[in-house]
A protein has these predicted regions:
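Sec-dependent bacterial lipoprotein signal peptides
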Residues: 1-21
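OB-fold and OB-like single-stranded nucleic-acid-recognition modules
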Residues: 17-113
Length: 113
């Protein structure tokens, strides 16, 4: 009886935890129709292939094998090239940083894992 109750509690906790996670999308799907995702919180994952920044914020390019997307990090620093990351943020169309313009970018809203 106790084991069954523990199983039920763990299942409920797992469901609550997963319900709070934004959906993970492929970068190619986002790039095909960025307007569909504009302003929405999503998650992407992949490897960092480029990055630049200073004083704790900057941009980095994440490639998930289907495409690549720039991510702006204001509070969490910029990972090095080759790092494997999962990022949660909001899609924004048109963004400027460091003298460069980005047509679509993910604005990081949670610390990455």
């Amino acid at each position: 009886m106790r084991a069954r109750a523990l199983t039920v509690v763990l299942a409920i906790l797992a469901a609550l935890l997963l319900a709070g996670c934004p959906p993970r999308e492929s970068i190619s799907k986002i790039n095909e129709d960025p307007g569909r995702y504009a302003g929405k919180e999503i998650s992407i994952a992949g490897h960092v292939t480029d990055s630049f920044g200073a004083l704790g914020h900057g941009v980095f390019l994440v490639d998930d094998g289907t495409g690549a997307m720039w991510v702006f990090s204001k509070n969490y620093g910029v990972p090095g090239t080759g790092a494997s990351v999962a990022v949660v943020g909001r899609i924004q169309q048109t963004f400027a940083f460091g003298g460069r313009n980005f047509p679509t970018i993910l604005l990081e809203t949670q610390r990455r894992h």
